[in-house]
């Protein structure tokens, strides 16, 4: 069977840059599924994406489905015919479904009986006939949150569509996709190359688009070119470009023919905190800031034009003129804000609502101030500095700079606090209170900052859960999952002596009578333990290891982490599987017994050598391991407990637990309970698979 290259290109108006990659990757994934479901043999499915097009190129696509033999078994002969030999309704219905009469059916005979059988040779459908529906289905499944409709038609898509190119080899596949008749026409760059041209063969793509249309259709190629050219441009001016992945992706999605240029701004603007300047350059203008080797911001920026100009200086000057007023605004706001102390913004917090049932930002500030001080006392941080940081934590939200450049919240608080002469750890805490903002983000760097960051997040968790607005499904408007994971990361990675139980109780207490959920403390703790599950799964821990630790519901995050590492190490020991099975057996035995057990094993009642040996080792280990448990040395404890494998195996091989002698039975059950309690001091290893 011959093979050909297939090309589909959807030509549109400018697509949303932040969604471009996800759109085309979904398109490729959907279409690959369609090909596989149809049984069409194919090679690589390559995707292309540019601001005004989504395209797929499939190598070595079979021209038709393979022929196939089908068999459909019908009713058993006993049910297929009545006593007079006439076909039953079941047989006739089955035959109709197969497109035959009962008389045309074959018979299938096995040692289990005889059935009606339909056999047929089905010729594979041509790829040309299948492709239009496959393309349409793949496009219909794209993750588009908001569809557009254009013109008088009822067609909906992410942006208006102008061209649809469907080529199988050199042949146009006739179809109407998204209201457009397929053709071999492709549109080039708006201002360079040929605005419109025809493509003779799918194999010519994307080279023909580059040569005639001046469009680099390969997304990764554009991105790599921007990165390399920007690095070289920065090197020429003695700096390093800030090429964050997210901005690189966005810029690559905005241009069809990237041309990297370097511009500058007035050095006087460097007196403004770099974060505000960078926010303007990256967030508003999509420019790449440039830093000197010492990490200081240079008065330059790199940007990407979408055209090759005979006079690039004109483009550079235009971009410099655009950014100058924004930088001047930042300078004005910075100077204006510093005319009063940060603390002077406190009264204005009373005018901003945090949440309707939970009060204003000033109310939240008071709670954070108290909670940060309480946390500082628990972890040995400076209580006065922590309460001071709590008091000032939201003041920068009322400044001109943060109002205009919202992403500078926190960092501007730090700069204004430094200007006011606040303690260094207080100022740093104002900046770091929102950390970690995302997975892998840095944690607060000092104890005061840790106290403030935890207080801010716990106040939100307690409040929102306290009014019954916890996350549901994918909806998490208050980012509670991120807040919970942030608290856990800070406590675990900084090894802080905090208990979720008392921490949550204190956060709830500070709300007074505002909360309506009587189970708020348990709900918050359960939610946070659930985030532990997700975190450790991402870290590569097995589900049963996590469940074994969660079964003990440890509420000290650092303690939880120590248990996780201990159980994970325990699983590598030779004795692990046998002891996990033994614990499961002990758990089942104890669960089936409703008898009241003694507080201790009666040594005089022990009879068999195996139970005497096991009982003695349990007593010895109980005393030996007590300091291990007190110090959180769970890994060492489980290594010691692994020595019980031999006496436990011997006990179950030689000793019957559920004997008729009640005194003997209860004594053996008590011993097993004491054995299990030792393991439960760490985790429920009976849950290990």
From Swiss-Prot:
InterPro entries: DALR_anticod-bd, Gly-tRNA-synth_bsu, Gly-tRNA-synth_heterodimer. It comes from the Bacteria. GO terms for molecular function: arginine-tRNA ligase activity; ATP binding; glycine-tRNA ligase activity. The gene is glyS. It catalyses: tRNA(Gly) + glycine + ATP = glycyl-tRNA(Gly) + AMP + diphosphate. GO terms for cellular component: cytosol. Coiled coil: none annotated. It is an enzyme of class 6 (ligase). The keyword Repressor does not apply. One of its GO terms (biological process) is glycyl-tRNA aminoacylation. Belongs to the class-II aminoacyl-tRNA synthetase family. It comes from Shigella boydii serotype 4 (strain Sb227). Keywords: Aminoacyl-tRNA synthetase, ATP-binding, Cytoplasm, Ligase, Nucleotide-binding, Protein biosynthesis. Its EC number is 6.1.1.14. This is Glycine--tRNA ligase beta subunit. It is found in: Cytoplasm.
